[in-house]
Amino acid sequence: MANDNGIKHFIDLSTVPATELRAILEDAKARKARLKAGEVERPYAGKVLAMIFEKPSTRTRVSFDVGMRQLGGETIMLTGSEMQLGRSEAIADTAKVLSRYVDAIMIRTTAHERMLELAEYATVPVINALTDDTHPCQIMADVLTYEEHRGPIKGKTFAWMGDGNNVLHSLVEAAARFDFNVNIATPKGSEPKSQYIDWARANGAGIMSTTDPEKAASGADCIVTDTWVSMGQEDHARGHNVFIPYQVNANLMAKADPKALFMHCLPAHRGEEVTDEVIDGPQSVVFDEAENRLHAQKAILAWCLQDRGLGA
């Protein structure tokens, strides 16, 4: 998404055209290949990425930090307690000030609206590294991972098990952008937000919703799940018992296509949403997903910065 000043923000998969998302994905593949071949790329030497963390993280922090360093740049981390974003200082003012210091801003926060307001007033690119509503960087890594293992994602079917959370919202947006299908199995009361499903369907995604996990898994090319309780939402969580039928185990995987992959954004609660047998099994690609956060996010950073004349 570009604002009125022509700044490219990576807000959601719905805000970036399909052609540009495909270009980012192919760039991620190329950058990964060059890194594995030992090539050193430093197009953003001297550039700085501000990383705002109002929700803690391992994968997001390390992958963005390492990614920016591999591109030749530097990072500075700002925690929620340090920032007091929107409390001691207006978000608009923070956005304007940071834009005078750094070349891009990454934010991992709670309310989606806080990230949107930051992007509205920033004069440098803003990257959504996670909100309570969406997780677009993770899904770019997931699409990259699927295509590495199984080829083009077009026409394939992903099956989601469990809570209708932020990762699922970005997954259905990806289904519209990359032309694949999503079967959603959630217990009643844990469905995804309707605006994400409605947008995905209106933009060509095949979305099926059910309370039956076996129906959703039937013939699927990939089974995806996440924790039953999202970070920071423990006080509002439903009892685990309602999710037990949605555990990804060997019996559920057997309903999918024999070549189906298993994905999880991690961290996983082993023995809850997924069994050890599945997450450690031959169909699991969870650690490839984790690695691919690095490569996908490097390509996202490059996409955000290229049009500003900052490297390639």
From Swiss-Prot:
Gene Ontology cellular-component annotations: cytoplasm
Among NCBIfam families, the record links this protein to: orni_carb_tr (TIGR00658), PRK00779.1 (NF001986)
Keywords noted in UniProt = Amino-acid biosynthesis, Arginine biosynthesis, Cytoplasm, Transferase
The similarity comment for this entry is:
Belongs to the aspartate/ornithine carbamoyltransferase superfamily. OTCase family.
Q: Which residues bind carbamoyl phosphate?
A: S57, T58, R59, T60, Q84, R108, H135, P136, C137, Q138, C265, L266, R293
Listed binding positions for L-ornithine are N166, D226, S230, M231
Pathway the protein contributes to: Amino-acid biosynthesis; L-arginine biosynthesis; L-arginine from L-ornithine and carbamoyl phosphate: step 1/3
| Molecular function in Gene Ontology | amino acid binding; ornithine carbamoyltransferase activity
What GO terms describe the biological role, i.e. biological process, of this protein? arginine biosynthetic process via ornithine; citrulline biosynthetic process; L-arginine biosynthetic process
Look up the EC number in the record and give it: 2.1.3.3
Show the taxonomic lineage. Answer: Bacteria, Pseudomonadati, Pseudomonadota, Alphaproteobacteria, Hyphomicrobiales
The protein's annotated catalytic reaction(s) are: carbamoyl phosphate + L-ornithine = L-citrulline + phosphate + H(+)
In which compartments does the protein localize?
Answer: Cytoplasm
Q: Which organism is the protein's source?
A: Brucella suis biovar 1 (strain 1330)
Enzyme category, top tier: transferase
Name of protein = Ornithine carbamoyltransferase
Job description of the protein: Reversibly catalyzes the transfer of the carbamoyl group from carbamoyl phosphate (CP) to the N(epsilon) atom of ornithine (ORN) to produce L-citrulline.
Name one matching Pfam family: OTCace_N
Q: Which residues cross the membrane?
A: none
PROSITE patterns of this UniProt entry?
CARBAMOYLTRANSFERASE (PS00097)
